[in-house]
Amino acid sequence: MTTFQYSLVFLVLMAVIVAGDVANVTYDGRSLIIDGEHKILFSGSIHYTRSTPQMWPSLIAKAKSGGIDVVDTYVFWNVHEPQQGQFDFSGSRDIVKFIKEVKNHGLYVCLRIGPFIQGEWSYGGLPFWLHNVQGIVFRTDNEPFKYHMKRYAKMIVKLMKSENLYASQGGPIILSQIENEYGMVGRAFRQEGKSYVKWTAKLAVELDTGVPWVMCKQDDAPDPLVNACNGRQCGETFKGPNSPNKPAIWTENWTSFYQTYGEEPLIRSAEDIAFHVALFIAKNGSFVNYYMYHGGTNFGRNASQFVITSYYDQAPLDEYGLLRQPKWGHLKELHAAVKLCEEPLLSGLQTTISLGKLQTAFVFGKKANLCAAILVNQDKCESTVQFRNSSYRLSPKSVSVLPDCKNVAFNTAKVNAQYNTRTRKARQNLSSPQMWEEFTETVPSFSETSIRSESLLEHMNTTQDTSDYLWQTTRFQQSEGAPSVLKVNHLGHALHAFVNGRFIGSMHGTFKAHRFLLEKNMSLNNGTNNLALLSVMVGLPNSGAHLERRVVGSRSVKIWNGRYQLYFNNYSWGYQVGLKGEKFHVYTEDGSAKVQWKQYRDSKSQPLTWYKASFDTPEGEDPVALNLGSMGKGEAWVNGQSIGRYWVSFHTYKGNPSQIWYHIPRSFLKPNSNLLVILEEEREGNPLGITIDTVSVTEVCGHVSNTNPHPVISPRKKGLNRKNLTYRYDRKPKVQLQCPTGRKISKILFASFGTPNGSCGSYSIGSCHSPNSLAVVQKACLKKSRCSVPVWSKTFGGDSCPHTVKSLLVRAQCS
């Protein structure tokens, strides 16, 4: 062989090694097909921009351990192209690094390119400069929009291809999404909307990724794109694929819901999520994505209007990346049970059998020795049914999974997974006035502003999304000083009013009602008076038709002076975009030196004050959080990086702040002397109440009945599938407890085998109780990082109350 031939062979081998294993991804009416093999896939949404590169490996590893096969993420256009033609893929924006990290863990990727994503993200992910393109109308058959959408989509796909990230190149991306929930707005555009959908599908095909494309909430998604479902109950609400040759895909199964300021959080139980996933699988669903699996943090100004900084904290992995139990563990067991059924589910015929008015059996299998069944009870009451000559007690509103059509391996209403208690502990108090310095914004006068208009300007058009804040000022003559009333009709989100430099009041809207009327009494000078209004946005809109037409800000300004009304809509107004502290970047070390700071003084006479202090990083590896419970409204920075907006003073209807703790990723921190800067808009904020906290799981609890199935054994080395899953139907259910890494069970706080009252949140000994409960559990668990206790009378020395369904409830402390 010649030297040239050796070189050629070497290059070919290197190309194969670099590319990895090329996969052929297709689909039929049952599921996605990867290299000729049908797959049931569980996916979890983890957004690279809502965490940090340092967190990615742990998040992905925990997702894999929880039975996730696919990591799903949006691609954020406004993050990657904040200015037209200027691209940024650095730091937490490094999507290539994120996808490669997913591949390193042996998982697939679903890439949701959008480019409109909604996602409670500023402007739905669209860059604001797009708003300024002449003649543009978003998300319809509009040439300027289509031009930029195509240019962006091609750029992202080209980037993915250049890194060999599609499965057709040996990469992990097996599925892509174009557009997002267009069915929610399509009617507003009528025929142009239908044309846009067809054009979008054609664009996706032309991008030639070698993997299938989906459109969610788009019932008429053109071939070959697959229409997919979003929502909490797709097993009940999804009409199904629009072609018999397309699989049933659930792109967003909401594990909780995003929270807005002033609204209570929506808590969704592990049992409810599992029920609807199992029901979707029973009805031939084959791909389920949890939105979110890890929500993370809306750092900076990335949250959309009125959305809090913490995002989907109730997901299986919480905001800090800690396991949210029992949600994480219960879904892991569900995934394992379904994987036990994968072969008959995908290769067998489905038969539906009525077991009662609200009870149904879905049976899968071609052969007698290859059979799986899913028993569904839609009733709110327990039901006993007969199936294949055996009796089954079905819990209320539950689904039972029978991998062999005989034995129950999993029931959605019976939780074997432990419950966790998350605790925040103050590590450093910033309570000394000597620790703080302050700098107060000055209220600009008309003559100090650089933008002039003879009418009221719209907020977003003026700020161009460079700041949440817009000053609008004017001056007028008053012949005599007199009590007067200022009336401002405002389209949100908040407004602070000043007359002659004095603060006279504030008002704000809500997520559901942006518009409000600020009406404040004031005293005017005899002669010239200066009126200054600070319009404040709390995130850009992110959904609905015609985003490019949205307006925010003052719509009318009036002053009643006791005799007549002055109208200011067509007065000369001066405008200033942003605050002085923003202009000088006072939240950075260099910018901080550009203004004159003063020693903190306990004065609440003026809002719009910047505070700065320094703190040392808490020891250990527990997540770090900033407790802002003593503050009002504003934004916080650590070492120049924004950890997000806060609005502690906006309480829910139950009287609670929407959010108190704000995540500081450890990668933002230095060992010592971290710069903390707070912008406080309101007068009531007190920085002396701020603490630096750590977050950890300090208590674990298990509550398992002797009627529960034994947990599915799932050795998680190469992924969940039938080959590496085993199940022993003769084994007893058990309580399993595990402390976080580095901690052990130090104390048993409660233990009762029998009929304990309550649950892990609130409990007491019931009428039936084994006196050996505490001793048995202490022997099995104390000084161990993990333990298990069989829920069986023999474990506790006998049955003191026969013919009674018993359970074991254990609560333990981790130290």
Curated annotation (Swiss-Prot):
Enumerate the spans annotated as SUEL-type lectin domain.
729-815
GO CC terms of this entry: apoplast
- Asked if the keyword Secreted belongs to this entry, the reply reads yes
Glycosylated residues, per the record, are N24, N253, N284, N302, N389, N429, N461, N521, N526, N570, N724, N757
Broadest EC class? hydrolase
What Gene Ontology terms for biological process does this UniProt record contain?
carbohydrate metabolic process
- What EC number(s) is this enzyme filed under? 3.2.1.23
What molecular function does GO assign, one term?
A: carbohydrate binding
- Family matches, as Gene3D superfamilies: 2.60.120.740, Galactose-binding domain-like (2.60.120.260), Glycosidases (3.20.20.80)
Which Pfam families does the record match to this protein? Answer: BetaGal_gal-bd, GHD, Glyco_hydro_35, SUEL_Lectin
Q: Which superkingdom heads the taxonomic lineage of this protein's source?
A: Eukaryota
Question: Which UniProt key words apply to this protein?
Answer: Apoplast, Glycoprotein, Glycosidase, Hydrolase, Secreted, Signal
Q: Which reaction does it catalyse?
A: Hydrolysis of terminal non-reducing beta-D-galactose residues in beta-D-galactosides
**Tissue specificity field:** Ubiquitous, with higher expression levels in siliques.
The record's active-site residues are: E181 (proton donor), E252 (nucleophile)
Q: Which residues, if any, are the signal sequence?
A: 1-23
UniProt-annotated location(s): Secreted, Extracellular space, Apoplast
Report the family membership: Belongs to the glycosyl hydrolase 35 family.
Q: What is this protein called?
A: Beta-galactosidase 16
To which species is this protein native? Arabidopsis thaliana
